[in-house]
C-alpha cells in the first residue's frame, strides 16, 4: 500500500475522552451498505425510541442527486465534480491548489458543526444513528480524516489551513460515539456492488478503514457479506442495548 496514502496524523496525549451516550456510528468502505443499514435501523428503532439518522460524511448521495437534477448541466456537473473530488482527495497526489484547500477546509468546518449538532441531539435523549464518522488517525477524506494533509501541503497558506484542519479533526476525535459498527467487506464483493468505483481505491480503503481505532471507541465488527437480514439483526441487537443502557426516550 502506498505510504503517502496512509499517513497517520499525530495523536494527542490527552486523557481518553468520554463517549456521547446514545450516539451510534456506522462506518465501512463503499459497498458495505452503510446508508441502507442506517436507514433500516432507524425505521426499526423508531418503533421503540425517539431515533434519528444523521450523515457525518462530506457530501451525501442525496446532495449528488440534487446536483444531477439541475437543468441541462446537472449530470455533467455531478460527474465533473466527482472526478475533480477524487483526484484532489487522494493523498498520492500533490498538494491541492489553494482554492481547493480553502474549500476542503470549509467542508471540515461544516463537518465539525454537524458533529456538534449531533452531540446536542444525543444529549437531548434522542437515539442518533450516524452514517460515517470523522477520525484523526489517518489523513484523507476517503477515510473521513483531514483532507488537505499536512504531509503534502505546500505554501504558507495551504500549510496553515492543513494544520488548522488537523487540529479540527483532533477535536472531533474527542466526540466518541457510544458504539461504532464497522462493516467489513472484501474487494471482490465491494467492486461487484460498486462497479463504477476504482478497484485500487476500493482496495486501499478496505485496508485502511479496518485499522482505524476511532480513539478507543467500542467497535462492533460485522461482515457485510453475510445475508442482509443477519447484518440488520446483529446491528439491531447492539443498538437496542445502547438505547437501553443510555436511557433513550422511549415511545412505549
Swiss-Prot record:
Family: To E.coli YghS and YghT.
Protein name listed in UniProt: Uncharacterized ATP-binding protein YghR
GO molecular function: ATP binding; dTMP kinase activity
Alphabetized InterPro entries for the sequence: P-loop_NTPase
SUPFAM superfamilies reported in the protein's UniProt record: P-loop containing nucleoside triphosphate hydrolases (SSF52540)
A biological process from GO: dTTP biosynthetic process
Source species: Escherichia coli (strain K12)
Keyword entries, A-Z: ATP-binding, Nucleotide-binding
Classification of source organism: Bacteria, Pseudomonadati, Pseudomonadota, Gammaproteobacteria, Enterobacterales
Binding site for ATP: 28-35
Cellular component, GO, one term: cytoplasm
Amino acid at each position: 500500500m502506498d505510504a503517502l496514502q496512509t499517513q497517520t496524523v499525530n495523536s494527542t496525549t490527552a486523557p481518553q475522552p468520554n463517549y456521547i451516550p446514545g450516539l451510534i456510528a456506522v462506518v465501512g468502505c463503499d459497498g458495505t451498505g452503510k446508508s441502507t443499514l442506517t436507514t433500516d435501523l432507524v425505521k426499526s428503532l423508531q418503533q421503540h425510541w425517539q431515533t434519528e439518522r444523521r450523515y457525518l460524511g462530506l457530501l451525501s448521495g442525496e446532495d449528488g442527486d440534487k446536483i444531477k437534477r439541475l437543468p441541462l448541466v446537472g449530470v455533467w456537473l455531478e460527474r465533473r465534480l466527482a472526478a475533480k473530488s477524487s483526484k484532489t482527495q487522494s493523498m498520492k497526489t500533490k498538494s491541492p491548489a489553494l482554492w481547493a484547500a480553502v474549500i476542503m477546509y470549509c467542508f471540515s468546518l461544516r463537518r465539525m458543526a454537524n458533529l456538534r449538532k449531533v452531540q446536542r441531539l444525543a444529549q437531548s435523549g434522542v437515539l442518533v444513528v450516524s452514517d460515517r464518522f470523522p477520525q484523526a488517525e489517518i489523513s484523507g477524506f476517503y477515510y473521513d480524516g483531514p483532507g488537505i494533509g499536512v504531509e503534502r501541503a505546500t505554501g504558507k497558506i495551504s500549510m496553515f489551513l492543513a494544520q488548522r484542519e488537523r487540529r479540527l479533526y483532533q477535536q472531533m476525535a474527542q466526540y466518541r460515539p457510544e458504539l461504532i459498527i464497522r462493516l467489513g467487506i472484501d474487494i471482490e464483493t465491494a467492486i461487484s456492488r460498486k462497479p463504477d468505483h476504482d478497484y485500487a481505491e476500493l482496495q486501499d480503503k478496505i485496508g485502511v478503514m479496518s485499522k482505524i481505532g476511532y480513539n478507543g471507541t467500542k467497535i462492533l465488527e460485522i461482515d457485510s457479506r453475510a445475508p442482509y437480514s443477519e447484518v440488520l439483526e446483529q446491528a439491531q441487537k447492539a443498538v437496542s442495548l445502547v438505547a437501553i443502557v443510555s436511557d433513550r426516550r422511549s415511545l412505549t
